[in-house]
Amino acid sequence: MARVCQVTGKAPMSGNNVSHANNKTKRRFLPNLQSRRIWVESENRFVRLRISNAGLRLIDKNGIDSVLADLRARGEA
């Protein structure tokens, strides 16, 4: 399963760990993904999503119906 948020599309980024001596080693910055079952009142059912914390906040702000409509328009849900 890919580490990509279904709502925002956030994916892992690459960067560097930088030590005190300024030595650099490659690392990955992973999105804060959560698996959530979210109740959709209009469909009278739960929807299971793998979303980042930013995606959860987006659902709180815009509502699950609006977010699901965007997902379906993109062909993801």
Curated annotation (Swiss-Prot):
Under the heading InterPro entries, the entry gives: Ribosomal_bL28, Ribosomal_bL28/bL31-like_sf, Ribosomal_bL28_bact-type, Ribosomal_bL28_sf
**Name of protein:** Large ribosomal subunit protein bL28
Q: Output the Gene Ontology terms for molecular function.
A: structural constituent of ribosome
Q: Which UniProt keywords apply?
A: Ribonucleoprotein, Ribosomal protein
Q: Which GO terms describe its cellular component?
A: cytosolic large ribosomal subunit
Q: Which GO terms describe its biological process?
A: translation
From which residue to which does any coiled coil extend?
none
Gene3D superfamilies attached to this UniProt entry:
Ribosomal protein L28/L24 (2.30.170.40)
A Pfam family per the record:
Ribosomal_L28
Please give the family membership noted in the entry.
Belongs to the bacterial ribosomal protein bL28 family.
| Region: Disordered, residue numbers | 1-25
